[in-house]
A protein has these predicted regions:
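Two-component/phosphorelay signaling modules centered on CheY-like receiver
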Residues: 11-28
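Receiver (REC) domain active-site loop signature in two-component systems and cognate sites
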Residues: 54
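Active-site T/S-Asp motif of two-component receiver
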Residues: 49-51
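C-terminal output helix
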Residues: 103-114
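Acidic, metal-coordinating helix/loop segments flanking the phosphotransfer/catalytic sites
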Residues: 28-47, 68
Length: 119
């Protein structure tokens, strides 16, 4: 079963994401530091789904740190803020995909399926 790490500092969003991705094995983290610790404990991690704006570091900073250990880690980044999603410039170049929050469950599941395949 594919393993996904979901990172978001909003507990209601974290719960929504974990539920929506229930067909996969899901680990959750409430902040980037917890995500780094959780990722170290997972031997086979297929995807990270992470918020972009979080208190201790941004999503692209988290991704850079995770990719130091897992260079081929696939990423789906989420943002709930009024950010223009410019795929030509950072931070979006560090990810394989991005979605704006709020998103439909089908959009989330579709993006995940494209990145890592069906469970």
């Amino acid at each position: 079963m594919k393993h996904i790490l979901v990172v978001d500092d909003d507990s209601s969003v974290l719960k929504f994401l974990a539920h929506a991705l229930g067909d996969y094995r899901v680990s959750v983290a409430r902040d980037p530091d917890e995500a780094l610790n959780v990722a170290r404990s997972i031997s086979s991690l297929d995807l990270i789904v992470t918020d972009y704006l979080m208190p201790s570091m941004t999503g692209d900073e988290l991704i850079a740190r995770l990719r130091e250990q897992r260079p081929s880690l696939k990423v789906l980044i989420l943002t709930g803020h009024s950010v223009i999603l410019d795929v030509e410039n950072p931070p979006w170049w560090v990810t394989e995909a991005h979605l704006a929050k709020p998103m439909e469950i089908e959009a989330l599941r579709g993006a995940v399926a494209q990145l890592i395949g069906l469970p």
